Amino acid sequence: MKNNICKAPFFTAEIFGGGDVYLCCPSYTKLNAIGNIFTQSWDEIWNSKEAVEFRNKIKNSDYSDCNMNYCNPNFFPFCREVAYVDPAKLDYDNPKVRIIKFSLDRSCNVACTICRDKVYCNEECRTNFLNSKIDEVFMPLLDGVEIVNFTGTGDPFASKHDREFIKRIAQKYPNIRYDFHTNGILCSKENLERMGVIDKLSTIQISLHSATEETYNKIVKFGNWKLLNKNLEFLSHLIEQNKLNELQLNFVVLSENYKDIPAFIQLCKKYHAKAFLWQYRDIEGVYDYDSVNVCYPLHREHASFIRIMTELDTSNPDLFISPLLRKYTQIKNVDEYLLYADIFSNQNNERYESKNGILGPRLFNIEQQIKQLQLSMEDNKVKKDNILKRIFSVENKYSNNAKHKIITILGLKFIFKIRNKGV
C-alpha cells in the first residue's frame, strides 16, 4: 500500500441526470463536475483542465481534493483494497475510462427515511428525455468499458429508464459486467433475467439498515422484509455458484437501528455478504440530524452506542467500517471516555424543537460550558493535572458561511453545527 495511489480518476466516471460528470462520488471529493455530457464531447470532459489537474495531484499522492473523512485508506481497508493500485499499472498520459456509474434517475419504489420522505417516480417526459439520450450520448461512451454501475440516486430496478438502458447495454456489449446499488426488493431472479444480466453480475449493494423486520419497517417505508430476504437468499446462492463476485449490505447508523449492528453482521454472514457500516450524514432525509446521530457525545444513547462499537470484532475480514465510525471502535478505556462524555452532556440540558418536532440538543456558549465542566470534574473528584488539555479542546471553524465548533474528547473530534435560535 505504501506507494500505491487511488485509481479512481484514471479509471472511473459518474454521470448524473443533469449531465454533470464527476471523476469520483461527489461526497468523496471536493472537486466540482469536470464537464457536462449533454453540452460537451467526452474527450473535452475526460481530458478537461479540471480532470488533468486532479489526476496530477493523485499521481503525486496529493489527496487535498478528497474527503478523507469518508474515503481514507488508512482507516477504511475496503477503500485500500479496491481503489489503490501500483502507479505502474496506470496510463498517466492516456487514461481510459473502465467503470462508469450512471446516476441518471431518482426513481425508487421505497422511501428510506435516511434518503427521502416519499416514493419518487420520474415523469414520463423525463424518462423519454433520458431514453432519447441512450443511443445519442450514453452508448458511445461504453467502448472499452468493463463495468457499468446503476445507480447512486435511486433504484435501477424501479426506474423505467434504467431498465431499458440496461437491456440495451446487455444486447450491444455482452462482455460488460454490472454493479447494482438497490434496496433489493426488485432485485429478483426474474428481473435480472428479464434485463439479460443474470450471468453478467459483478457486485450488488443492498441498503438494508437493519437486522429485524421491526427496525426495517421504521426506516424503509413501503418496503417488504420477506421479499427482500427471499431475494437475499437467491443472491447468496449466486455467490456460492460463483455467479456473483460480491454481495454488499449497507447499514447507515442511526439511533433507531444501532442496536441491530451485531445482528446485522450475523445476517451478512448468513447471506455470504460483506457488512458495511456508515455514519449518517446531514445531507438529506427526514431526520433531525442531532436527534438520530448517536455518534455525538451529547446524544442520550451515545454511551450504549459506544459499548456496541467497542465490542465489534474489527478483525472480521467481511466487516467494513467507515472512517468516521471506526474511531469509536478504537476507544481503549470506555469507562473513562464515557465519564467525560457524560459530564459534558449533562451541562447541555437546554433543548430546542426543530422543524419536524423532534427534540435535539442545542449547542451554544460551549466555552462557558467547558468552564462548568471543569467545576463538575472537581465535584466528581476527577484529577485535574492538565486534564482539560488532555481530554478537551474547543475551536471554531467556518465553512460555507456556517459556524461550527470542534470539540475534542479523548482524542476524538466532534464537529457541531451552531444553529440559530428558532431553527
Segments (PLM) and residue ranges:
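Boundary detector for helix-to-coil junctions that initiate low-complexity/charged tails
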Residues: 345-423
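Conserved alpha-helical substructure of the radical SAM core
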Residues: 31-34, 39, 73, 77-204, ...
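Short clusters of small/polar residues that mark proteolytic maturation junctions
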Residues: 25-26, 161, 418
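Catalytic cores of alpha/beta
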Residues: 255-271
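N-terminal pre-core extensions flanking Radical SAM catalytic domains
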Residues: 1-125, 143, 315-364
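Conserved, mostly hydrophobic/aromatic
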Residues: 42, 206, 249
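Conserved strand-turn element in the central/C-terminal portion of the radical SAM core barrel
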Residues: 232-259, 280-282, 326
